[in-house]
């Protein structure tokens, strides 16, 4: 076994392809880290990509299955974003129904998301870019009657959102920052 131990100890490799891949991964992670604090700009880019995708689908009049798949994926991600990490109904069963649904509790329970905001954005960006790339190839343009897909998606959206809202009302949590108290630092 004749290899340079200093390369393997430092995580490097003598193979230039692997070295280049590691450099690209570090550069990619660097840009992700730089983008992380800019939430509004990140979501604006996602909105722009989604608009571009919708224009592509509308103008090409095809790839409706890709659009439907992207819609289902984004709906699934959104529901994971709204859902608490720890299901309160399971905790209630474990506590032998000590805390009934709707009963007021003075115990502070922070809302921890099942899917954090950055991962939601990142997964959505990746899915949208992949969908845009798939819409460039005619092999993925499966002929389908799109109004059926649209009606099924709307029905699925309303049923899942109704269930999610009922869960939010039953266990009294608000997953969004809208309407919550904001405390500012007083400089006294």
UniProtKB/Swiss-Prot annotation:
Principal cellular location given in the protein's record: Golgi
Pfam families assigned to the protein according to its UniProt record, in alphabetical order: Rer1
Single biological process term from Gene Ontology: retrograde vesicle-mediated transport, Golgi to endoplasmic reticulum
GO cellular component, one term: fungal-type vacuole
Keyword Transmembrane helix: yes
Bilayer topology term: Multi-pass membrane protein
This protein's record includes keyword Magnesium: no
Biological role: Involved in the retrieval of endoplasmic reticulum membrane proteins from the early Golgi compartment. Required for correct localization of SEC12, SEC71 and SEC63 in the endoplasmic reticulum.
Family: Belongs to the RER1 family.
Protein name: Protein RER1
Gene name in the database record: RER1
